[in-house]
Structure formats: C-alpha cells, structure tokens
Design a protein with these regions (language model features):
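Active-site-proximal flexible loops/turns
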Residues: 9, 135, 213, 246, ...
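Sec-dependent signal peptide recognition
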Residues: 2-10, 242-245
C-alpha cells in the first residue's frame, strides 16, 4: 500500500510539473477568460491604427459594457461569414472570439495576457481573422496582434490587417468570400523561439479586433492555443496537458500492478 501511495505521489508530481508554467488558461479550456485581461470600447471617432491599451481597463476609450458584451467563448462550429470554411475553434473545446458580427456599430475589443520570467523554449498561439470589406486603410474594420518583450520593450511579432476595399489591407494569407464581402484567414499559427537572449524575460500578447470607423461593417478574430507547445489542429480534440500527464502516470501504475 505504501508503495502504491508513493507511486501515486510520483504521478501527482508529474502532473504538477505539467501545470507549472507562465501561461494561464492560454487555450481557454476553462470555458472562460480566466487569466486574461479583457477590454473594449467605441472606435467610431478613431482611425487606424488603433492603440489597444486605450481600450483596456484604465484606458481612455474603455467601456466595461462593451468589453463584457462583445467578446466571449465560442465552441466548435463553422463561421457563416467565411462560407462555412472556418472552424471557430482551432484546438480543443473552446476558443475566444474578440469582438463580434452581431452588433455592428464602430466597436473595438481587446484581449491581453502577460507572462513573466518565461523560460520555455517556445511561445505559440493561433488566430483567425474575419473582416467585412469597405472603406480605406485608415477607417476599415481591422485586427492588430502583437507579442512584445516587456523586458526590452521590443516588438517581436506584429500583425496588422484591415478590410479596405479592393484588398489593399490584407496579404496572401487571407481569402475572400464574395457572398459576404468578407476577408478571412484560415487558422494562423505564430511561433516565437526563446533563445538565450530572451529566456527569463516578460512577454505580453495583445489582440485587438474592431468594426470600421464609419460603424457599418464588422471585424472580429478568434484566438486559441497561447502556450509553450504548438496546439494540435481542429479535429483532434486534445486533453489539456495536465490531464494527459495524469492519465499517463496512472496508466503506467495500472500496468505495473497488473504485471505483479
């Protein structure tokens, strides 16, 4: 019995190691925004590019009602504005939708998370944007994605796109759905390798999505898989790493005692 308890403790230690790390709910598998900072506000009077900090709590354009009412958890399913070509979830059971398309009116929403003293070898995250086309580069619906090294104030990953008429605000990763006049991307996987010059630094991921400035066209983005391991694609509904390690540990115990 004591040996069994000892082995169970070992399995628990393995699980605890799986839980260790800087990211909090990076894959949204808690079914909510725990670990993240949520923001939102009205951008009808502001031109592109937008300042995400202005829409976060304490920012000049922050509105709690917009922050809490325009973004949220989504479950697997096809996005109608892409011609049902995009699954709303990249990996697992949930992702986060930044902004929406149900309430168009010149709104912007933001989600952000900071990780400190980061030492894992990589940072990954997945995103997919959906933008309704109209207007020019400075007033079209837009998305802005940044990963910043806070320790050195260095912008490491930056993605900024908008739905200006004619496709001038997007690049080849975007597709166009004529039926909804929408520019959209399949899921994009971002990776930052953490070498010796970055190990131990603090990093911030900030994602903004916004309707157009004239307030008549939507823009939103799905976010998933912020963590140290590349998220597996949709279709393979993975266990969170912690539960996978627990299952591995307990499975090994069962095999060990079955052989005795």
């Amino acid at each position: 019995m004591k040996r069994l308890l000892s082995l169970l403790c070992t399995a628990g230690a393995i699980a605890a190691c799986a839980m260790a790390g800087s990211f909090i709910n990076g894959n949204f598998e808690t079914g909510d925004s725990s670990g993240w900072t949520i923001g939102g506000g009205y951008r009808g009077s502001v031109y592109n590019p937008l300042n995400p900090a202005a829409f976060l709590p304490g920012g000049a354009l922050y509105s709690a009602s917009i922050a809490n009412g325009h973004s949220g958890i989504v479950t697997p399913g096809l996005d109608p504005n892409t011609g049902n070509q995009l699954n709303r979830v990249y990996s697992g059971n949930y992702s986060w939708r930044v902004e929406d398309f149900e309430t168009v009116g010149g709104y912007a929403s933001v989600i952000s998370q900071t990780v400190t003293n980061y030492t894992d070898p990589n940072i990954f995250f997945a995103w997919a944007a959906v933008l309704e086309g109209a207007h020019g580069l400075t007033d079209a619906a837009t998305v802005q994605i940044t990963l910043t090294d806070l320790t050195t104030s260095t912008l490491l990953i930056s993605r900024q796109y908008n739905a200006a008429s004619g496709g001038g605000g997007v690049d080849p990763r975007f597709k166009y759905n004529a039926a909804t006049n929408t520019y959209w991307t399949p899921w994009q996987i971002e990776q930052l390798a953490i070498d010796a010059t970055l190990a131990g630094h603090d990093f911030n991921l900030s994602v903004l999505a916004a309707d157009c400035n004239p307030t008549g066209h939507f823009g939103y983005l799905y976010l998933d898989g912020f963590g140290s391991v590349a998220p597996p694609p949709t279709g393979d509904v993975p266990e969170p790493a912690t539960f996978g390690m627990i299952a591995f540990g307990l499975g090994a115990l069962a095999l060990k005692f079955r052989k005795r």
